[in-house]
Structure formats: C-alpha cells, structure tokens
C-alpha cells in the first residue's frame, strides 16, 4: 500500500514542474497524479521545490494545524506553488481545474520515524 509520505509526494510535490506557461497544468497533473479517479479532488496544491526542501519544513516553524493538531510546520521561506481548484462546471469524470501560481509559505503536517510531511495543510503569506 502507498504510505502517507509517498501519498504526500504524489499529491503535492512536483520539483521539476511549473505552471508558469501552462494554463492546463492542473488538468494534466491532477490526472497524472491520480486525483481524479473516483471523484474530482476539489482543491490541491503542488510545490515546485526540491523534495529535500519540502521535507525540511518539518523542522521549521511549529504552528497549529487547521484541525487543531499540533504537528504542523510552516516553511520559513516562500516556495513556488501551484493551486489547482476544480471549476464550477466540472463534472466527474471530466474534471476541469483552474491553475493559479503563487509564492507562499507552506504549512504541512509531519509524522513518522523519519518525520516527513504527510498532509498539506495550507499556504500562507510568509511571516516576517
């Protein structure tokens, strides 16, 4: 079975990619990364930074998670991300997404012996 850490990488890490010149980025990636198989996942964020940099966030600023848990961490620096949001006229299995890129600080939940990201909690303006 796919581990939580591997699922996080599949759903949220695209180190080599960028949506900068591709309005279809989300439509392509949401299918390629298997997030449209049983439904159209409504919202998803891809992080375009090296995996090691994303994993390092687990040792950065400890912040509360949206669900109240305490194992979330915010990156000190902003990261190049792409937000994918399902469009209102999207009908499964023809999932259609709006692609928005940003530079933001990311918040991830971490767990396990290696203490790696297992959940993408939010993207926020970097705190000064």
Swiss-Prot record:
Binding residue positions for substrate: 7, 10, 41-45, 66, 85
Recorded superkingdom = Eukaryota
Residues annotated as the enzyme's active site:
12 (proton acceptor), 119 (proton donor)
Q: Which reaction does it catalyse?
A: an [RNA] containing cytidine + H2O = an [RNA]-3'-cytidine-3'-phosphate + a 5'-hydroxy-ribonucleotide-3'-[RNA]; an [RNA] containing uridine + H2O = an [RNA]-3'-uridine-3'-phosphate + a 5'-hydroxy-ribonucleotide-3'-[RNA]
What is known about the tissue distribution of this protein? Answer: Pancreas.
PANTHER family registered for this protein in UniProt:
RIBONUCLEASE, RIBONUCLEASE PANCREATIC
What biological function has been recorded for the protein in this entry? Endonuclease that catalyzes the cleavage of RNA on the 3' side of pyrimidine nucleotides. Acts on single-stranded and double-stranded RNA.
Can you say what this protein is called? Answer: Ribonuclease pancreatic
């Amino acid at each position: 079975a796919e581990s939580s850490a591997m699922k996080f990488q599949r759903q949220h890490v695209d180190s080599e990619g960028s949506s900068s010149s591709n309005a279809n980025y989300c439509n392509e990636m949401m299918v390629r990364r298997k997030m449209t198989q049983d439904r159209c996942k409504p919202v998803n964020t891809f992080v375009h930074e090296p995996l090691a940099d994303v994993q390092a966030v687990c040792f950065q600023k400890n912040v509360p998670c949206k669900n109240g848990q305490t194992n979330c961490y915010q990156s000190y620096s902003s990261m190049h991300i792409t937000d994918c949001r399902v469009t209102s006229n999207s009908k499964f299995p023809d999932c259609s997404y709006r692609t928005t890129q940003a530079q933001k600080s990311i918040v991830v939940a971490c767990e396990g012996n290696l203490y790696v990201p297992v959940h993408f909690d939010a993207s926020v303006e970097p705190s000064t």
